[in-house]
Amino acid sequence: PEKNAVYREAALALALSASERALEASGVARDTVGAILFVSSTGLATPSLDSHLIQRLGLPATTIRLPIWGLGCAGGAAGLARAANLVTALGTPVLLVTAEICSATFMHGDRTKSNVIATALFADGAAALVLAPEGDGPEVIGSHSHLVENSEDVMGWTVTPEGLQVVFSRSIPQLVRTLAADVAAAAARSAGLEARDFANFVFHPGGAKVLSAYEETFSL
């Protein structure tokens, strides 16, 4: 309970700051925002923190709320895809907010490699952006999702009396080698492109072995 209380307070503060900056930078009138997505996986809150953000930010009471929990490292990318879907459906600006308090998941006394790696890789932070039907910024041209069968135990949390304990499988680098290229190609095709059309990639930095697997797979 103590860790989750820290999560709720810190995540809200970081999310509020990031949202204020995103709204200001976008120039979008707050009374035109049609939906807010709040993405997180390192703590729980009911009602979800987007309800607090709507009130603190002065967004309309009619703003659609979509909390997204449990997608972990993929949450931000998935949130961006769903936000783009909502912009298309609603025809209004949409606010996307992500916040994680990874320090609240550190397990004192847990000397497993997974706990040490997670502590080294992940930190506390928040990010926000405004998507709109029209504008001069970057455009979301498509999204793609792929579920690997029987992969539920590869990454995630184990709920313990002390809190959320990270789960990392040793198979992650091999999954990158066997699946990443085909999934990337399918994602490109879903947007009417080919993998060779991309000059740059953004990879999740899941440790040195994972980055090496990406280098091998994409000949970087």
Where are the predicted features?
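Short coil/turn connectors at secondary-structure junctions
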Residues: 30-34, 61-64, 89-94, 116-117, ...
